Amino acid sequence: MTDQPAPTDHLIRAADEVKIRQRLVRVALGHVAGDTRLRVGKLLDVHSRMWLSDQEIILSGRRIAYVGPAGSYPGGVAHEVHEPDLMAVPGFGEVHKHIESSHVTPEWEAALVLPHGNTWTCEASHEFSNVNGPHNLEFWLTARLAGSPQKIFPLPGSAVPPTAYEWGGGHFGYDEQAGFLNESLMVAGLDEVMDWPAVWNPENPSYDRLWGMIEATFEKRGVIEGHAAGIRDMATINAFAAAGLASDHEAWTTEEVLDKLRRGLFMELRPHSLSEMVKGLLEAGLEDWGQFALTTDDRSCSDTLKMGATDHNVRLAISAGLSPEVAIQMVTINPARHMRLTPWVGSLAPGRFADIVLLDDLPSVSIRQVWADGELVAEDGTYLKPIPKIDWPDWATQTVKIDRAMMADDFAIPAKRGRDTMHAALLRPFHWDDDFITMDLPVKDGQVQRDPRRNVTKFAIVDRFSGEGKTSAMFWLGTGPRTSDTALACSMGHDKHNVWAVGSSDAAMAMAVNALRDIQGGWALVREGQLVATVRYEVGGLMTCRPPAELDAEMQALYAEGEKIDWMYEPTVSPRWFPGFPERLAFATLTCAPWRWVLVAPSDRAPDGFVNVATGQTHPVVW
């Protein structure tokens, strides 16, 4: 048998996999020399949760060919690396992450998180999917094909669109999901099913679309990720599990976690509640953590630069009382098993990608080196590899399609003739009540006015897909600027990602939205009639193709300008809603459960944009 060169091994392809593994067999037997012998002081076998002393890992191409006691390998190698003082653990994985929330493109995301041990990510891709659904898979695989060592396993978004009352950018059903799963083995399944009321209501206009995507995923035995926010009663938890929705990352209490765990859900713990959850579960006597993973979900590059990536989540779990070994299992073998990716990632074992994290201290998860694809890619927190140069095409960079200048009149809310006041429907950020708030607001010059004395300002959604700039506007309570002629606008508005704006004057709102149109997305801040800060997200209106430090500098400048503004604030049910610069308004535009009344861009089913997504009922914003 002649020795044939292995395939490039960037993406998982069945035919290539056979050739790769045929070669790995020969390397493991010593018939063909390995590329590198990496000898370490200790190695964590995550299958048994046992430490093995003085081990060698034989690397061949991008994979592991052999693991065993030092000196046991029967063949030769081209290179020798000996790290007797370091401990080897598998590359860390993200079971559920929106890379878009880092706001850097995948090639820069790799440079950002690989020094923190994050070698693979299951990308919950409904953000970019909602901007450009047809190019979704191409977008997520481009960086890997260009040479990035990070593995991205996309899960096409079920929330495309998030509800039947939103449109533009992408529309996924059975045909699209079947196509993605047939196109690439990198596709791990179906991204979080968020509109769960539609799953068990045949009258909901999203019912057939969602079940079509579920069917297509079952056909390929893919994983169907869940999003069970607001589900706490036993009947609904059972219905959620019965639908085949396999996981949840939205639990807020220990009791809720246990109720969902006992119905078979895979539980994904997020950092903001992780410590409390781990402590509560330990107090409850939980011993088997095999049905748990740690997940980031959303984290900006600014926060990653400050606190870390997956390694930060592991440290939180350890500080809450978990052993380091269990915490590491929760970012390696556990998520790999759940996502059915164990032949490729999740452990230091033959056939897997040669993704290895070398620690010099276990309790603090101090990372000395990170190996990926069989090469050293990061050391002492520094990324060592060149960044692939990707010239993102127009389908990725020309996505804020507003083909005219927005005017103050676009944000006006007219009053009925002869009225001094109008009844107005209001929302707060993260308003999950069954009904909206009602107030009487003053009328001036034929338009309904804000009332800053009562913490009332104006909020708007601008369609960025049709080119027409169709706008819906209403009054919101407890957010936005009190400073005159001031507005904030952003093109990341989960999950449809139309442009949103909040402002103390219609003219300032128009100025901020026009600035976003000019830079093709990001943030724009107008203070007292002047544009004072912008942050550019030119890729999808969600990300930038620039170094994370450069983006962070722009964000810090935005925050600094934001500190000069008097921001309204009232608490809501969300524990993650804080006073000051209202960055989390980007999440306050969500339309999935437990939201009821929401504001969306004008659509056929919601012509004025104000709709109850649970019932389909619409209502005027003033009357």
UniProtKB/Swiss-Prot annotation:
Keywords: Hydrolase, Manganese. Its EC number is 3.5.4.2. GO terms for biological process: adenine catabolic process. It comes from the Bacteria. Gene3D superfamilies: Metal-dependent hydrolases, Urease, subunit C, domain 1. Transmembrane segments: none annotated. Its cofactor is Mn(2+). GO terms for molecular function: adenine deaminase activity. InterPro entries: Adenine_deam, Adenine_deam_C, Amidohydro-rel, Metal-dep_hydrolase_composite, Metal_Hydrolase. It catalyses: adenine + H2O + H(+) = hypoxanthine + NH4(+). It is an enzyme of class 3 (hydrolase). Belongs to the metallo-dependent hydrolases superfamily. Adenine deaminase family. HAMAP family: Adenine_deamin. This is Adenine deaminase 2. It comes from Jannaschia sp. (strain CCS1). The lineage of its organism: Bacteria, Pseudomonadati, Pseudomonadota, Alphaproteobacteria, Rhodobacterales. The gene is ade2.
